[in-house]
Amino acid sequence: MTATSIRSSLFVRHIALPQDHGSWVFLFSPLLIGLFAAQNFTIASLILVIAVVSAFLLRQPASIAVKARSGRRSSRDLPIARFWFFLYSFVGLVSLGTLIYLGFGYLLYLAIPGVAVFFWHLYLISRRLERRQMGIEIVATGVLALAAPAAYWVGLGHPDPQGWILFGLVWLQSAASIVYAYLRLEHRRLTAPPSFPTAFRIGRRGLLYTTFNTVLVTGLAFTGFLPQLLPLPYVLQWVETIWGTLFQPAVGAKPTAIGIRQLVISTLFTVLFILTWNLS
């Protein structure tokens, strides 16, 4: 067997890489926000990025392996899933060990919730209960939001309470995004645009989340606790939620179109957050 054929047999995209492409933004948004907030990118920051991405990628082959063992996937997927699982684990552990050697051992505390959610996710897969678990997805985005304080602390070289503020701010946005995404997917099942009262009723949770976020951040910015311009990215998400809930429901829209729109809004949020946090 040639090297090319070995690579082609091992690199099976749906096993090696996550297929829910929208999840990438929930990883890189907090990571980039934390890195830019620290305003100091070091070799330790690069190692942290490698460790975080490895941990994120680990979920896909682990999920495939559980599905293969439970009969939901072909048993032929199991060896490939094992290969990627051990590769990501090796890279992640080496990166984590390097961070500990450099004096960032306290980051291990941030990994504890991630380990718990990871095994809970695998349990749900084994029970065939992983689909449409909005609560679990909100908790999972909270775990990914821990990348913000991790990147911030590594950039500073030490823990700082402001890292927890970044974590909370990022998680608020991620949770609202998850709720809104579920609403847009629910719109797809409608045969006609709903009336205004109906649209408000089925979308009130998403409206509540984004309104709460906007009011909270605006109030904290007004008191000087947060940068004055930081409400802008939250206003963006709030306006998008109002528009998509009340005026342009995703009736009959393709999931890909919904995902792309969510990706664009989340990307704009991240860019605006970085700019307003650092320039205010």
Protein language model features and the residues they cover:
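Helix-coil boundary and interhelical linker segments in multi-pass alpha-helical membrane proteins
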Residues: 32-48, 96-110, 146-167, 217-230, ...
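N-terminal signal-anchor module of multipass membrane proteins
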Residues: 1-50, 57
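Solvent-exposed interhelical
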Residues: 67-83, 172-214
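Hydrophobic, aromatic-enriched interface-forming segments
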Residues: 135-190
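Core segments of transmembrane alpha-helices
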Residues: 25-31, 88-95, 140-148, 204-220, ...
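Transmembrane helix-loop-helix
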Residues: 43, 47, 83-120, 210-249
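Intramembrane alpha-helical segments
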Residues: 93-98, 106, 111-151
